[in-house]
Amino acid sequence: MPAKYWLLPLFALAVLAFSAHGPARADTQQFAVIYVEFLPAKQDRGEELVEQLAALGRRNGAVSFTANEEIQRPNFFVLLAIWNNAAARQTFDSLPQTQALLARITALLEAPLDLRLGTLIE
């Protein structure tokens, strides 16, 4: 097929694709996914601590904060937190209670925490 038939529609699609999304806004909902792997001998205590962290998050402005245990690996958890904006998440991260719980969790880990942040897209 000659280029004259597909070049103009392709160009139009490219313009639409690159102009559809503006820069990320600070007031959009943010999420954090944290993968936590405890030492097998410490998984019960670790589970208590991640549940405390999730409860603390819910009390301090999280839209949602869950701690989910992997079925096949009972020492592996995925924490999912949703915040109204980046400032709310950063405020929670800087709380002394949050820092204390994270320090206690870190002492029980098999591997470092794997934190992934992002912006929710509607």
Indicate where each model-derived feature is located.
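Glycine-rich beta-strand-turn "strand-cap" elements at beta-sheet edges
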Residues: Y5-W6, A17-F31, V36, V63-R73, ...
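An amphipathic, aromatic/His-enriched active-site/gating alpha helix that lines ligand/cofactor pockets
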Residues: Q52-S64, I82-R116
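Short, surface-exposed ligand-recognition loops at beta-strand->loop->(often short) alpha-helix junctions
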Residues: E37-E48
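Bacterial N-terminal signal peptides that target proteins for export
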Residues: M1-F11
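Solvent-exposed loop/turn segments at secondary-structure junctions
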Residues: A41-K42, I71-R73, W83-A88, T98, ...
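Short glycine-/small-residue motifs
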Residues: F76
